[in-house]
Swiss-Prot record:
Its cofactor is Zn(2+). The gene is ybeY. Binds 1 zinc ion. It is found in: Cytoplasm. InterPro entries: MetalPrtase_cat_dom_sf_prd, YbeY, YbeY_CS. Residues 162-205 are annotated as: Disordered. This is Endoribonuclease YbeY. One of its GO terms (cellular component) is cytoplasm. Zn(2+) binds at H124, H128, H134. It comes from Beijerinckia indica subsp. indica (strain ATCC 9039 / DSM 1715 / NCIMB 8712).
Length: 205
């Protein structure tokens, strides 16, 4: 069962255009496909009213969150804030935040479409919400394998192909910057941190 999906768009960059030569992203369809594929492959049982929230923002906004929750005063591509409830009981699985400038820059540098890269970031963020991590080398390898299979189901090439999937320190990496780890939820929600962008809800199935 795909959870209910809440999407909020804080930065107009997400709705104006993709990278050069690309059409604007269809965020609703992209997110629903990515999370649906992740749920199917992970084989998880979710609460009937499970919900996940996504915020599409700019680098300045995610930099503030990264500094507040992880002590890193820099923008990043994606942050995840899992619920502290047990997965099978959680009505709110958590939040995924993705920044436009960093994500678009990575996609361009890696010669991949913005849609493919953002799909990867959504999958990566959602896997954090359901318990995957990459703090240790073994965890990173397991998470990367799951990402590769899910993205293949979506018709997206292996994002780690030609790179060192696991760095010596155990971080899962892509060119330019590692996909970011999750933060602690600390009982916050996107409703508390969102400055008033566009939002919409997709029905689960």
């Amino acid at each position: 069962m795909v959870p209910l999906i809440d999407i909020a768009v804080e930065s107009p960059r997400w709705t104006e255009a993709g990278n050069e030569g690309e059409d604007p992203l269809s965020l609703d369809a992209l997110v629903e496909a990515a999370i649906g594929a992740a749920v199917a492959r992970a084989g998880i049982a979710l609460h009937a009213e499970a919900e996940v929230s996504l915020l599409f923002c700019d680098d300045a906004f995610i930099r503030g969150l990264n500094h507040q929750w992880r002590g890193l005063d820099k923008p990043t591509n994606v942050l995840s804030f899992p619920s502290d409830e047990d997965l099978e009981d959680a009505r709110l699985l958590g939040d995924i935040i993705i920044a436009f400038e960093t994500s678009a820059g990575e996609a361009k540098a890696e010669a991949k479409s913005l849609a493919a890269h953002v799909s990867h970031l959504v999958v990566h963020g959602f896997l954090h919400l359901i318990g995957y991590d990459h703090e240790e080398a073994e965890e990173a390898e397991e998470m990367e394998r799951m990402e590769q299979v899910i993205l293949a189901d979506l018709g997206i090439a292996d994002p780690y192909h030609g790179t060192a999937p696991v760095a010596p320190g155990g971080e899962a990496q892509v060119p330019n910057e590692a996909l970011e780890t999750s933060g602690k939820r600390q009982d916050h929600s996107l409703g508390e941190i969102l400055p008033g962008g566009m939002s919409r809800r997709l029905a689960g199935s």
